[in-house]
């Protein structure tokens, strides 16, 4: 890239402008990276909490596992698992759209209270909690994934600015400055030499 840049005053000016823009934008990128690091940590905690709630609900259901061999109870549980609607929205976090669960609507249980034991209500409650937490954990993991991906992308850009773009532009500015300085010295020398020759010719002409 640098070999294609002409060593001129205009190129020097453009490189200085480029460096100023890079150095102005870098702090914004670093701030975004810092904010994303905080948000990723929050998302990890949120995801872990939702997964834990999901697993606890699952363990509560497993405590009744031997009862699932009874068809009547299986039907009662199956009727309580239906998800009618999951309302999802999106929120903007440091310029990134991430999913959030607004509401989860489950169908009303339709099993017969008279034909099932009283503890079936507890099992159905655990089952509904299991379904809700499963959905929330999936959305929380998706939110975490999106934020982690954005953090990786921003980190790459910060590294690109710090390790490549800014150093390369700085070196190019110095290279052009040295070239222009050397050329200026050469030009001054040539002018002096030309004046000296003119003066010599003038003196020789006067002597003749």
Curated annotation (Swiss-Prot):
Entry similarity comment: Belongs to the V-ATPase D subunit family.
GO molecular function list: ATP binding; proton-transporting ATP synthase activity, rotational mechanism; proton-transporting ATPase activity, rotational mechanism
Protein name as it appears in the record: V-type ATP synthase subunit D
InterPro entries associated with the record: V_ATPase_D
GO biological process terms held by the UniProt record: proton motive force-driven plasma membrane ATP synthesis
UniProt entry keywords in alphabetical sequence: ATP synthesis, Hydrogen ion transport, Ion transport, Transport
Pfam families: ATP-synt_D
Top-rank taxon, per record: Bacteria
């Amino acid at each position: 890239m640098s070999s294609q840049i002409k060593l001129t005053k205009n190129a020097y000016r453009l490189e200085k402008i480029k460096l100023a823009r890079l150095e102005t934008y870098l702090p914004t990128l670093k701030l975004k990276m810092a904010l994303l690091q905080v948000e990723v940590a929050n998302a990890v905690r949120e995801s872990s909490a939702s997964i834990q709630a999901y697993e606890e609900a699952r363990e509560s259901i497993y405590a009744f596992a031997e009862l699932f061999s009874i068809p009547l109870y299986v039907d009662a549980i199956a009727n309580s698992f239906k998800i009618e609607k999951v309302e999802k929205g999106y929120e903007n976090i440091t310029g990134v759209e991430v999913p959030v669960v607004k509401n989860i609507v489950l169908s009303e249980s339709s099993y017969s209270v008279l034909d099932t034991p009283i503890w079936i209500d507890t099992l159905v409650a655990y089952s509904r909690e299991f379904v809700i937490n499963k959905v929330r954990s999936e959305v929380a993991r998706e939110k975490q994934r999106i934020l982690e991906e954005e953090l990786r992308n921003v980190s790459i850009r910060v590294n690109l600015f710090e390790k490549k773009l800014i150093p390369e532009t700085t070196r190019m500015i110095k290279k052009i400055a040295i070239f222009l300085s050397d050329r200026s010295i050469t030009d001054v020398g040539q002018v002096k030499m030309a004046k000296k020759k003119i003066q010599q010719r003038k003196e020789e002409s006067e002597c003749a």
